[in-house]
Regions:
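Single conserved hydrophobic/aromatic residue that forms the stacking wall/gate
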Residues: 1-12
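Conserved proline-anchored active-site loop of SAM-dependent methyltransferases
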Residues: 12-14, 86-87
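Short, charged, surface-exposed loops that flank catalytic or proteolytic processing sites
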Residues: 14-20
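C-terminal catalytic and target-recognition region of SAM-dependent MTase-like enzymes
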Residues: 20-74, 78-141
Length: 141
């Protein structure tokens, strides 16, 4: 659950938002009551999650990923391997469920039961890698 979402929902609903700056300002206003030492970090994380949710919705990312996972077996030759990178838990759940179902149906001969995460070194070199998860599957012969 998103912290303080009710306050934001009311402000967003009652405002005309036509720029990302206005949306960020509304988020800042709704979180103005927070203690100063926590405020900056919470605002940053809230903005990240809000903009991510908008991007996912606008780009139909779940629908596209679902369609990709449905078509993936047809794109792999027997013994072919696929690796899928996900960047948030919703994507990862969808991929995990699809690979598991494909394995149970005999479409995949093997798949990653556990997620593969980037190393600490990789995250240090590329901060954006920290939320990445990888899962894989092998097309049945």
């Amino acid at each position: 659950h998103e912290p303080y979402r009710r306050q934001r929902q009311m402000c967003i609903r009652d405002s005309r938002i036509d720029t990302t700056t206005k949306l960020r300002h509304i988020i800042e206003q709704t979180l103005d009551f927070l203690h100063e030492k926590d405020k900056k970090d919470i605002i940053k994380k809230t903005c990240q999650r809000t903009f991510q949710a908008l991007r996912i919705d606008v780009n139909h990312e779940f629908e596209v990923l679902y369609e990709f996972m449905e078509k993936l077996p047809g794109a792999l030759k027997p013994g072919g391997r696929a690796a899928i990178l996900t960047f948030h838990s919703g994507e990862d759940k969808l991929v995990k469920k699809a690979l598991k179902a494909g394995y149970k149906a005999g479409i995949y001969s093997d798949y990653s039961k556990d997620v593969i995460r980037p190393s600490a070194q990789e995250c240090a070199q590329n901060g954006r890698a920290r939320s990445t998860k990888m899962r894989w599957a092998v097309r049945a012969e």
